[in-house]
């Protein structure tokens, strides 16, 4: 996980594992990953639920085609096969699109500073500015998200619905 990108991260995992083992000597205990996925698991689950296939699928032939290598965003961009880039990141303002010489549409966190963007649409954040649903990191449970504050920004769902209606 990218959350464990630091020196000796494996020692932290080993310590947690040893703690769970020690606790299990007298009681019951388990360790669950809680690292943030920034919605990756939810997107993958939604794609699988709606199309029968996870992300890295294409729909150019009116039916889903799944190929995790050829249809990865990195591969398509690297090979110059993308006409434009739609970048969506409502949770992390530091997750910005790669610097590519193609048109970029960014739908993102209001504090995102995406350089060289053709279109930027700020959105509110699920679980903070509006309700929503996300999948837990183990992809087995969907969790309802509440609202902590009011926002004048549209939600990602509202923006995507408006784009779809305009097409």
Q: Where are the regions that the model predicts?
A:
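Non-catalytic alpha/beta scaffold blocks inside enzyme catalytic domains
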Residues: 2-28, 51-167
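Short connector loops at secondary-structure junctions
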Residues: 29-56
């Amino acid at each position: 996980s990218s959350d464990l990108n630091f020196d000796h991260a494996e020692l932290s995992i080993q310590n947690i594992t040893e703690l769970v083992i020690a606790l299990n000597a007298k009681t019951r205990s388990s360790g669950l990953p809680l690292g943030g996925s920034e919605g990756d698991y939810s997107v993958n689950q939604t794609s699988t639920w709606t199309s029968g296939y996870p992300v890295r699928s294409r729909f150019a032939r009116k039916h889903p085609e799944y190929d995790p290598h050829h249809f990865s965003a990195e591969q398509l961009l690297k090979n110059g096969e993308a006409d434009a880039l739609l970048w969506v990141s409502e949770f992390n303002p530091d997750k910005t699109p790669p610097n590519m010489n193609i048109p970029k549409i960014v739908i993102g966190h209001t504090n995102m500073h995406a350089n060289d963007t053709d279109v930027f649409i700020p959105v509110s954040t699920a679980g903070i500015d509006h309700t929503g649903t996300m999948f837990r990191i183990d992809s087995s449970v969907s969790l309802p998200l509440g609202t902590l504050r009011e926002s004048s920004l549209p939600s990602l769902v509202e923006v995507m619905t408006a784009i779809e209606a305009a097409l």
